[in-house]
Amino acid sequence: MLGSDKFSCFSDQHRARSPSPTDRKDKKNHTNKLRELALLIPVTMKTRDKKYTKKEILLRVLHYIQYLQRNIDMTKALLKLHSSNGKGRFVGPGLNPSAGQTQQQHSTPSSSQKPSLWSTSSKPRKKKFTRVSEHPSWPYNPRRSLALDQAENPNTIHPGLKEENEECATYPGVLSPSTYPTTEPSVSEGDGQGAQLVFLDMAQNIFAYDILSDHAVEVQGGEPNADIKVQRSFFLTRAQPCVSSCRQKLFLCTSSEADKEAPDSDPWLPVWTSEDSPNGSPLALGSSQINTWHVADYLNEILGVSSSLFSSPSKILPDHVLEDGTYFLTEGLLESSPATCEVESPQEKEVSSEGPTGPPNFQSSVSLDHCYLSLSENVKVLSNCGSSSESTDTESLWGQEEVRGVATYPRRTGVFSLAQPSVLQQANPEGLQTSSDEDRDYTWTPTGQSSGLPVASKKIKKVQASQGPVKPKDSRKACPGQVKKKCVNGFIMFCRMNRKQYIRACPGTASTAATKDLAQLWRGMTLEEKKPYCTKARRFSRQNNRIVKQENSSSEDDDGETPKPFYQLLAEKAQVSLGLTSLPTPNCQ
């Protein structure tokens, strides 16, 4: 009973937790609607392999809505600013607070702790951009700004803003999203046709003293500059990893370009405009600003990129590091100029200096670990070093004997340059050595670098050392001290000349089985049928310096009878003999 009660309770809880089909359908509909809403955003999301979660899509949509709300608030503020009669203006930082009560009638009251929007008006005047450090008495500000123009006097601050600064420093408040910016006109002591700078601060966690903390004064000799009546203050937020922390934007509005906005502004990057930029395009600096503010400093400040990336490496590295390679670090890296990538050792330099000098070959100057010589280069090396081998191709015995070219496939022999054959000759002064008589390939086995050779090559080397030096292939005389090999008899020549053809006639037959069948056929052959094979074997042995009996050799060599192949012998035996079953037949599998 207790077990059934527990199972029933568990099933009830599982039904309560599991969503119903209608809930699943509604949830799917909400997800589809959210994705459709994300597709409506002009700034498309980056494509990636993993799908975006609902939270990421929702945050993307909310960020875009925030961006639209900021633009709407800014437009309302600008419309309200330009629709005002312009009589009462707000005294911005750096102006004289004794201008009268009419200058403050349209300003934000001092009881408000969030002066988010304010503007200044001054005569257009070019000024060098200077950076001023933060005030030491104020706490650490995560939203540090770069002051491009300085205020004239730090003490002449609007009283209302000063009170707000004190209140916010004591009780720092947070701007709520529902707080809308208010417009505050500025005073124009001249003709009033100057540009108006509107600072729109939309960050949610900004103190009131944050704007004032970025103001400083440019003092020359302890006294302010008397020629400057009003100076504009430019604030540019530093690019942060989090996009939401960069909310302060700087907009330049003139009386003639009040309704023009930047059409190509990015909603996720800090934007500022200049007077020379067309249609208020972002990230545009005038010629005077470019002359006074270096591009490398700008990129270092905004993007956080080191200034060393914008200068030549030869200006940064010391001379003892560069030595003679300044060309390769400046023009060689920044321009498409040919340069060698080979670092030669002192030994290689000595060898190359002895050889003929010529124009450098940049294609063949790269050192290789595995070097394979071509046929033409191999012939040169063979003619210089000298070697000999035996041709064991049995099929050439039926026709004319031809001399085949031998290709060289050397082992792993260290690093040397293809463009310097003298290095190759120096690495192997004793010349190339031969392998067994059945192998037609030469193996280059130098004596100085034999540590990396396999065991088989070492054994071959020992046998070759016991045989003594080897003469070239064309020489017919035996070398002194060389041990002659055994003579080739008629049966061996018969097998060499017929084994391959026997295997071709019966595909799949093993070589040992073919040899056994040929041996059975050899036993049934007469002396006259065996004589051509014995003559061919004796001639081959004399040509290759093997042990040959001298008796009756001249008369046998003059006989030019051609040997009969195995299939002709089988046909003749089949016609003569009555018992065909006793004759050996090819065992085709």
From Swiss-Prot:
Going by the UniProt record, its keywords in alphabetical order are: DNA-binding, Meiosis, Nucleus, Transcription, Transcription regulation
Highest rank taxon of the organism: Eukaryota
Q: Which residue spans does the record list as DNA-binding?
A: 484-552
Q: What happens when the gene is disrupted?
A: Mutant mice develop normally. Males show defects in reproductive organs with smaller-than-normal testes. They have severely impaired spermatogenesis and the absence of postmeiotic spermatids or sperm in testes and epididymis. Female ovaries are degenerated with apparently fewer mature follicles at the age of 4 weeks old.
Report residue spans for region: Basic motif.
14-27
Which InterPro entries does the record cross-reference, listed alphabetically? bHLH_dom, HLH_DNA-bd_sf, HMG_box_dom, HMG_box_dom_sf
Entry comment describing in which tissues the protein is expressed? Specifically expressed in adult testis and embryonic ovary.
- Can you give the residue ranges of the bHLH domain? 14-68
Per the entry, what this protein does is:
Gatekeeper of meiotic initiation in both male and female germ cells. In complex with STRA8, directly activates the transcription of a subset of critical meiotic genes playing a central role in cell-cycle switching from mitosis to meiosis. Temporal expression of MEIOSIN is required for meiotic entry decision.
What is the name of the protein in this document? Meiosis initiator protein
Q: Which species is listed as the source?
A: Mus musculus
Q: Identify the taxonomic lineage of the organism of origin.
A: Eukaryota, Metazoa, Chordata, Craniata, Vertebrata
What gene does this protein come from? Meiosin
